[in-house]
């Protein structure tokens, strides 16, 4: 006798016996082997179906339990409708107030570091600084003070908390909706212009607040709080600079010749060393001036994201003009033009890019520089430690590394387009000026750049590192200098600079800011006063701005 304990196995046993019986009966009609296989398959399927129906996992009414500890309820659905209504009202809401709100979730290291940055900003900022701590209901926001006792006593910022009722709601709402509700209450209460968060905040926090930030009604800036000292310069920005915090973009233009090609690969590695993903890399435009031999570019292409790398080869062409190597795509993209020289290859790094962005924000977006920024054509980082002043205004660019402002560079391109049609045009007293690196692209363009500066009253801001505290040597790495200035940021005082006779004009005169403006105005009038019938130009040169007389 066969004893079978499992019901499923019993079904299979009877099905097999049934199969044998049917096969025996139908043997005269068909081949036994084929029919046996067919009926065996049918029997096994019937047996498996019966067994699986007895397992709960395969019931039609069975559902896997949610992995979220808080179940979504009808209360959460009502909240979703409330949030949608709030987002629609933002389209007709009042303008944001002069408030900067730092926002964090939990009591991790990122919250502590963000709190430190907020306190530092509150000590010097003219705007109101608020700190919002989002909570899941298990930790009271006041605990943040316990973790920062030493800082709180000297911290003038206002603390925001919406913990009332959070403990009750935490049982009804999923965590994302709970954080979203607290964030929404803060926006209703103060309507900040700028919201600052740590880029290392938990993902659930960004999921909660992003619906309010994606419509661009509020400016949202993220800070790398793991590098607290390196990002302390952010606390020195004013409201206007913070609102444009994400605006500056820097493209890097490398001009490379036969003798400097050997530096290119290491230069690219240094520049891209600290970028975490391909979207952080700047667009890189490489212009290779080769005599005859074509270099192997595989290693060059392998060290930079392909969608951000542009390589142009130039053979036996030494007179390429600066306007041919780059074109600003918009008014927010700056060009860092680096003309590699065999005797002094520059040092490039992500720190330098960050430092230049900081200077862009201070110069082109800072409230104190609003009356001067339109006259700034470029920023020139100076590695000459012999400079007596930290900042110099100059109409002559004697450097092989220059950051050009996009709007002014567009004007320079328009100027050169007309200028090249008038090769005999010249400015008085501008001849005979000696420029370094005449054979390079920047050197070839310097006379035209100086001419352009002088006519329109523009200047370049030459920023030196000579006020570095402590011992200083030419061997000190650029990254060390940049790191120091990011940890000890200083705001450029344009009013103080403009009062000094540091303005170098095209003919090497040292004038005050106002004196140089008057000189440029006189020069501009001289070249734009076009002759007409019965009259002569006020200056004995033909203006490139004039229509030819018929």
From Swiss-Prot:
Highest taxon of the lineage: Eukaryota
UniProt-annotated glycosylation sites, renumbered to this chain: 296, 518
Signal sequence coordinates: 1-53
Keywords noted in UniProt: Endoplasmic reticulum, Glycoprotein, Signal
Record's keyword annotation contains Glycoprotein: yes
GO CC annotations on file: endoplasmic reticulum; membrane
UniProt keyword annotation of Glycoprotein present: yes
Subcellular location field: Endoplasmic reticulum
Protein name as annotated: Uncharacterized protein SPBC1E8.03c
Record organism: Schizosaccharomyces pombe (strain 972 / ATCC 24843) (Fission yeast)
């Amino acid at each position: 006798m066969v004893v079978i304990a499992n019901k499923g196995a019993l079904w299979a046993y009877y099905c097999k016996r049934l199969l044998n019986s049917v096969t025996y009966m139908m043997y005269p009609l068909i081949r036994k082997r084929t029919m046996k296989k067919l009926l065996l398959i049918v029997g096994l399927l019937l047996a498996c179906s019966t067994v699986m129906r007895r397992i709960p996992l395969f019931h039609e009414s069975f559902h896997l339990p949610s992995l979220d500890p808080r179940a979504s309820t009808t209360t959460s659905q009502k909240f979703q409708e409330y949030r949608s209504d709030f987002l629609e009202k933002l389209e007709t809401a009042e303008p944001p107030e002069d408030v900067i709100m730092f926002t964090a979730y939990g009591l991790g290291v990122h919250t502590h570091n963000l709190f430190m940055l907020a306190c530092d900003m509150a000590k010097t900022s003219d705007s109101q600084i608020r700190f919002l701590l989002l909570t899941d209901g298990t930790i009271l926001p006041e605990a943040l003070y316990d973790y920062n006792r030493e800082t709180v006593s000297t911290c003038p910022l206002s603390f925001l908390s919406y913990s009332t009722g959070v403990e009750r709601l935490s049982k009804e709402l999923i965590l994302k909706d709970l954080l979203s509700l607290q964030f929404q209450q803060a926006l209703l209460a103060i309507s900040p212009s700028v919201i600052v968060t740590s880029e290392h905040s938990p993902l659930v926090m960004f999921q909660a607040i992003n619906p309010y930030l994606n419509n661009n009604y509020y400016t949202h800036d993220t800070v790398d709080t793991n590098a607290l000292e390196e990002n302390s310069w952010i606390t020195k920005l004013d409201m206007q600079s913070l609102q444009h915090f994400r605006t500056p973009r820097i493209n890097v233009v490398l001009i490379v010749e036969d003798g400097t090609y050997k530096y290119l690969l290491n230069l690219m590695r240094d520049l891209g060393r600290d970028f975490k993903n391909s979207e952080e890399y700047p667009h890189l435009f490489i212009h290779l001036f080769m005599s005859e031999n074509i270099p192997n570019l595989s290693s060059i292409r392998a060290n930079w994201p392909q969608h951000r790398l542009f390589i142009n080869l130039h053979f036996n062409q030494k007179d390429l003009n600066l306007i041919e190597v780059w074109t600003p795509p918009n008014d927010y993209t700056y060009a860092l033009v680096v003309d590699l020289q065999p005797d002094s290859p520059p040092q490039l790094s992500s720190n330098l890019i960050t430092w230049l962005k900081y200077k862009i924000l201070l110069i082109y977006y800072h409230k104190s520089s609003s009356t001067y920024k339109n006259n700034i054509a470029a920023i020139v980082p100076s590695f000459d430690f012999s400079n007596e002043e930290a900042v110099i205004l100059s109409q002559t660019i004697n450097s092989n590394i220059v950051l050009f402002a996009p709007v002014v560079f567009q004007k320079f391109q328009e100027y050169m387009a007309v200028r090249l049609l008038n090769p005999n045009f010249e400015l008085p007293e501008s001849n005979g000026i000696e420029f370094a690196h005449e054979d390079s692209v920047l050197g070839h363009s310097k006379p035209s750049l100086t001419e352009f500066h002088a006519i329109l009253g523009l200047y370049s801001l030459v920023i030196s590192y000579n006020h570095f505290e402590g011992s200083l040597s030419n061997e000190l790495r650029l990254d060390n200098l940049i790191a120091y200035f990011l940890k000890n940021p200083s705001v450029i005082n344009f009013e103080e600079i403009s009062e000094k006779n540091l303005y170098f004009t095209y003919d090497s005169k040292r004038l005050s800011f106002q004196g140089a403006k008057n000189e440029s105005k006189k020069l501009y009038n001289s070249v734009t006063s076009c002759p007409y019938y019965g009259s002569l130009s006020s200056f004995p040169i033909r203006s490139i701005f004039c229509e030819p007389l018929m």
